């Protein structure tokens, strides 16, 4: 059962947040979920950005992020009130596209490179390194950014598809200015 929460507030555009459980049972599966989340909505070339925002113009912004500590993926979007239902449907459709393997090797490789590039800059500042190793501690991992990048590059198409197929919608939150 999907939990649905709607709140009313005087806002110009609706705020739609969809929470998904990633169903990862190991650190390795969480790595797969991390890359899948980036492919889904974590980069400027992601499914959500390219399709929901750019191609269909359903959202002012639309992105996904993974909370690895909780095993939850969030999709955040700003939507015109009249586009909320269509945006929800399209977000779920884009996830189904990944579940069915409807993404190119080029998209996967670009996502991997963007992930690796973001890991390369961790060592550029003491505060970034501190944040990295603190988050690793909470994950019960001792992987360096370099080791993490190496692991991400080895993730296969089939592992991304499997990660997507473990994802289940848990909660839909809508902050809307219109009384529906």
Language model segments and positions:
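Mature, solvent-exposed C-terminal subdomains and processed small-chain segments of exported/organellar
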Residues: 1-74, 78-180
